[in-house]
């Protein structure tokens, strides 16, 4: 069975971070995006199911690029949660 994948923007702090940890602890692949790469790295270093993808959501072309990177890594995205 393939693991489910969720992409969470605003995943480095607050609700986004809490949600990322919750899904990761349930065995999901969790792609998190935020502007602060250092926070993304801290979170992904703490949980093997969390992967950071730096992103400024105001850049539409970068949003598309990051979404494609996530799809390429996990083959699918089951849920997108925009917590920005």
Which residue stretches match the model-derived regions?
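Conserved glycine-rich cofactor-binding loop
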Residues: 10-14
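Aromatic pocket-lining residues of Rossmann-like dinucleotide-binding sites
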Residues: 23
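Conserved glycine-rich Rossmann-like NAD(P)H-binding loop of the short-chain dehydrogenase/reductase
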Residues: 26-43
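The beta1-alpha1 cofactor-binding region of Rossmann-like NAD(H)/NADP(H)-dependent oxidoreductases
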Residues: 55-66
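Conserved catalytic-site loops of classical short-chain dehydrogenases/reductases
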Residues: 78-79
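Conserved NAD(P)H cofactor-binding loop of Rossmann-fold oxidoreductase domains
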Residues: 83-84
């Amino acid at each position: 069975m393939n693991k489910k994948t969720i992409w969470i923007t605003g995943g480095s702090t607050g609700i986004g971070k809490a949600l990322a940890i919750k899904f990761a602890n349930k065995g999901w692949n969790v792609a998190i995006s935020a502007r602060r790469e250092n926070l993304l790295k801290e979170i992904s270093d703490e949980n093997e199911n969390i992967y950071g993808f730096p992103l400024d959501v105001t850049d539409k072309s970068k949003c598309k690029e990051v979404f494609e990177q996530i799809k390429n890594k996990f083959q699918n995205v089951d849920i997108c949660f925009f917590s920005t």
